[in-house]
Amino acid sequence: MHELAIATALAESLIKYSREHNAVISCAHVRCGILSGIDPEALQFAWEPAAANFPGSGLENCRLQINRALLQHRCSSCNKVFEFDSWQIECPECKTETLRRESGNEFVLESIEVENV
């Protein structure tokens, strides 16, 4: 389960930010693409033990909010950007099959919520 390693790396990054800014992080918002190879349920399950590995870090009560990113493509002909949750091989606008993937394989820390200290 590589989600535990990902959750641990995320916790380490949040701790670094927390220490640099003297902040307590209450929630981390991440975007996880459907082609990222990360199972959102497994990542959510791994978050609590990963955060607990750093006692006194302030992450003990930090929530993890996972937003799922669909596949997003741009048509090379008409430049339309569209999302879908299945394999699609043509533009819904002009029916061209020359598509460029814009997103869907990312894992990004989008934002954090910080408590007043």
Segments from the language model and where they lie:
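Short loop/turn motifs enriched for small/polar and acidic residues
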Residues: R31-L35, N67-L71, I112
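Short, flexible, mixed-charge glycine/proline-rich loop motifs
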Residues: R63-L70, K80-D85
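Short functional micro-motifs and their immediate structural scaffolds
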Residues: E83, T96-R100
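Cys/His-enriched microdomains
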Residues: H73, I89, F107
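Short metal-binding segments enriched for Cys and/or His
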Residues: R101-S111
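Short cysteine-rich clusters marking metal-coordination/redox-active sites
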Residues: R74-C78, C91-C94
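Long, charged N-terminal interaction/targeting segments
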Residues: M1-E60
